Structure formats: structure tokens, C-alpha cells
């Protein structure tokens, strides 16, 4: 039995814990104040004065384990100091005080405290259906679509010749984000289905008012032909690439055509054989099969519509649904919702084995109030010196909400790192991992492709001081700054998706000032290509730092002092390498890149320099070959070459489309200034000046209001207007 304490507070706390089932006996592991043998107060003060400085700033970096030691000094110190704010670590027999971890400002998810509901902007209608998909990977890789040359290119016909069967509010219904609530708008959900003409044949029933969905309008232009309009990123008129919506009321054996009419990129992987994705609930139930590549007659082309003076593009494809009356989903890439992330994190913290070395905290709240989670993963340290010797690795994902492949790579990374594999154990013993699996939860929830609810690309605002407008980015950068003040960060990597290039590759930062380090940043990507030969393309990696990309996480972290700072880009399509050439990536393929990242990290930090030396030698040869190909001359030394000589443009995204102030501040600056009304005295003074300049009167004679009024009435000075 637990020995009763004389302290009334301790007795109350004990009863409280017992009442809620957190404490039943001594095996509970919750320390309660005990009576210990007496000790001099001077002994306690001597121990504190001789101990190492408090590591309160490091308390969030790894999972702290309270070790029960048969040492009465520890408890007598607490009693002598009369404080519960200090806890003690032991380096041998020597107690080292540190501040107790502060209570979290936000709720920490746990089995006894469920995750907070998903918050939506108040103007968003949200259906109550719980959308869930099974994870499944095909037994054989799915091949690219091979064009026949006979693909049709239907042009948009508008609502005059078509029948609108689905329509929701546009992204610009509100000019900027105001506030949010769980479940979105208040009151009953408005119907989004309409039918202008009576149809003998049943029409498809569309829906997208759920997490990550973004279909705005569906127009039936033929019996089985539908024109689709995607909703742009919320509070913007740009960024239509990602799509995800539900379809019901279909017929089996009928060929349907879908044409998305408002895509904004001039080129796409759909032109290189990429296929859309289809999920059938009946197929999942009957066969246990999930997302599949689908479609024929696939074509990506420019249509006859313009928006803001820019041409729009269409994606068209045909398909047959497998069952009558099924519920199906169509998507650009494998969806990965905010709720799915919460479900996965709940599993992690509910497992006592993984929870021993994985601490989950809330880094901050997004604009809508959704939690931005950060995981600290490391093995418990046996001593203070061992803890301080660990280097750090920072990994983030999903700053662009439509790049769901980044979340699948992140899940693979976490699955490997939290597993019981020997390599995973070695990684946890060697490093402290700071992981932010979803940087832009608001954008993910509402189905944006690129922006947050500020209407801006977060990956262009890592330098911004606007904490309230870009909280997820501001707190991430601040966390890394504090981490760098305590220990070396060996690698930073942000997981992304790419819409124009196949394979997986990296963007890095080139060291231009130190020629001896010009190859160092290329070693990690080269090792990745060796560990994933049929998926990772080193030749697609770029290391230029464009001025327009100065606000990206990769460059900002590099300027903070992280030499190996990267974004890892995974295609939406598939591979053009090795045995996987011409095949799509599955979710297992994407997760395998997370496994590969962990393997490469061990190779990169191997104490044996042999791998590093071989890679540097190979890089020197490859770089000279590339320069010879581009410049047409031999190069003996790499020291006098700039990155302009070495590589061309990264052909990345156009960052200017979503740069600038947050939308709500932009609207304030665009408001017209009110015209200031002048007083009568000011108007009279101005009128007097005009009279004098006209030379109709004696300039030396002062004019009074009475004289001025008289001359005005006689029309001698100026016209009435």
C-alpha cells in the first residue's frame, strides 16, 4: 500500500488520481512524496551549487525517463527546497537539477484525451460522412498509359449547353480567413446538387465537401460526359492541380468521360503517361483492393478559356465503374488527410514500446486552430554527456497540402524509425529526431493544392516575421534555431511532391564560398540514388539557390547553419529507371523512400570514411563530365567554377504566384483612402490663392471672406463649377 503523506496537498492529489483510475498502488509508477531520513539543508545547497547548469531548454528534445534510485538525497532535496519545479538526473551518484517540463499550452493527445476535432473555416460546408480508405498495394506495378494518338480534346461548353449537377461556393466567397469551428459552417448543410433539365437517365451524384476534397462544379454536357471545375486554393484565384471527389449513382459497363477544365499548369505528367486514381468501396469490401490507376483516352491540353489573361488547360479521360450503385472516389494522388495523421499518431502514443522513445507535442496552432504536431524521437540517454553528444536531424512534410506523396514518404520514415529493427535502434541511439509530419494542416483539410488559409505559399515565407499570419512556419524556424543553439543539426529535409518530373530527387544548397566543400552537399543525394536505384534519380537533383527561392525552408535552414539542407521531391507519376521504368508509384513505393532515407542517413554518418571518400571521388568525375558536356572543354579543377557553370534551372514551381503579404493584410492595403474634407477656413484660403494667381485683383490687398464672396458672386474671379 502507498504510504500516506502528511501533506494535505499530496493526499488530495493521491485521492484525485485514484478516483480517475490513474493510481491504484505502488506499481503505478507515479512518484508521491515520501518520508526520508533527515539531511542537512546545507548538504542540499552544496549539491545544487556544485551541479551542472539546468537543461530546461533541452527538456523537450528527448523522452525523459524518471529512474527510481535508492538514494534518499534525491527526495530530501525536494523536501529541503520546498519546490516541485526541480527534478534531478543522476550522473553516477551526483544529482544534477533541472527544471521540470512545463505543462503544455495545448492538449497532448493520449488514449484518455482524444484528439481535438478538425477545425474548418466558418464558410465551409462539411458533410458528416466519415471518409476512410483501406491501404493496399497492387501485386504488380501499374504501367503508364500509352497514348494512341486518337484521344479526344473536348472543349468547355459552359452551363448554357450543359446541365449543372453539382455546385458549391467558390474559393473567393470570402475575401480572407476570419474564424473557424469544428465541422465548418453552422446550421444545416445546403444541397449542392441541382438539375436544370429533366433527365431520363440517372446522372452521377458528386460530392467533395469532406477533408481534402475540392470539386467546385460538375456540368453534364452529354449523357455520360461531365465537365468538372476544381475549386482554387481558398481565398485565392490560383492553384488548381490536386483533385479529390466522390461519385455515386453510376452504372456498370458504361463508359463515362470526365474533363477537368480549369487546370493552370502548361505541362503535366498526364502528358507522359500518368493515370488518375480510382477507389471503389465495393471493390474494397469484396476484394480487399484499394486505390487503382484508371482511365483511357487520357489527354492534357490547352482549352479555349482564359482566366486573368492566362490560358487554362484541360485533363480528360474515360473510365468504366466496376459496379452499379457503387460509391467511388477519384483523385490526383493517394489522399492523406489530417484525420489519418491523427489516427496514426494515436496508434503511436498508445503503444508503450514506441511511446518510450517518441514524445508527441503540439508545436503550435494553425490559423484555423488545428494542431501542428512535432515528434521528438530518440533513445533515452543514460547520462548528461551522452545526451549532449547526440546530433539532431529535422524532417518535415506537407507544407504544400496537395502533395500527398510527401505524407506517404513521411509515414514510411516514421514506421522505419519507430520499428524494432537494428538500424532503427542505432538511429535512435545516435540522433535526436525532430519530425513535423504536417506543416500545413489547414490547407490539407480544405483541399488546397499549395497555400495556407493566409492565401500564400508557406514555403516562400520562412523568413517572414509575421508569426500570427504564418504560425506553422514561424514556430518551425524558431524550433530549429533553438536546436542549433544546443547541438549540431546534421541533416534537414522537407518532403515534397513534383508535378512535372518523374522519379524521386532532391534539391540542395551549393556552398559557393568554400570550393573545398562544393561536392559535400551532393553526397547524401548520391547515396540515396545508390540505395534506391530504380526510384531515385541523382541526375535530376539540383543545387542552385535562386533568388526567388530565398524564402524556402531549404535555403533558410541552410543559412541558419545546416550544411546538408534538402527538399526531397517525389513524383506524382512513377519511375523511368531500371526495372521499374514506365510504372506508377504505389503507396508502398512512396513509403519505401522513407525507409531509404533512414538507411542513407546511417551511410552518410558512418564513422568509417570509406563510403564518403568513394562518393566524393565519384562526384568529382561526374561533375567534370557534366561541365565538359555543357561548356565543351576539359576542367582540371572545380574550385573556380560557379553553380551557373555546373547546372541549369531547377525548373521548379513559379514562386511569384503566391508571394506577398497574407490576403487579409493585402485587402487592408488595397482599400481606397477616404477623401479628407477641408474646413471652411482651408477652402477660403485656397480660393484666395487661386484669385491672387489669376491676377484679377491687387495682390497686395488682403482679401476677407466677405470681399471674396462678393467678387465670386459677380463672376470676376472664377467660374462656378
From Swiss-Prot:
Zn(2+) binds at residues 400, 403, 496. One of its GO terms (molecular function) is tubulin binding. Residues 672-688 have a biased composition (Basic residues). Residues 334-605 form the Peptidase M14 domain. GO terms for biological process: protein side chain deglutamylation; proteolysis. Binds 1 zinc ion per subunit. Its EC number is 3.4.17.-. It is found in: Cytoplasm, Cytosol; Cytoplasm, Cytoskeleton, Microtubule organizing center, Centrosome, Centriole; Cytoplasm, Cytoskeleton, Cilium basal body. Its cofactor is Zn(2+). PROSITE patterns: PEPTIDASE_M14. Residues 703-714 have a biased composition (Polar residues). Keywords: Carboxypeptidase, Cell projection, Cytoplasm, Cytoskeleton, Hydrolase, Metal-binding, Metalloprotease, Protease, Zinc. Residues 43-71, 645-721 are annotated as: Disordered. Belongs to the peptidase M14 family. Metallocarboxypeptidase that mediates deglutamylation of target proteins. Catalyzes the deglutamylation of polyglutamate side chains generated by post-translational polyglutamylation in proteins such as tubulins. Also removes gene-encoded polyglutamates from the carboxy-terminus of target proteins such as MYLK. Does not show detyrosinase or deglycylase activities from the carboxy-terminus of tubulin. Metallocarboxypeptidase that mediates deglutamylation of tubulin and non-tubulin target proteins. Catalyzes the removal of polyglutamate side chains present on the gamma-carboxyl group of glutamate residues within the C-terminal tail of tubulin protein. Specifically cleaves tubulin long-side-chains, while it is not able to remove the branching point glutamate. Also catalyzes the removal of polyglutamate residues from the carboxy-terminus of non-tubulin proteins. This is Cytosolic carboxypeptidase 2.
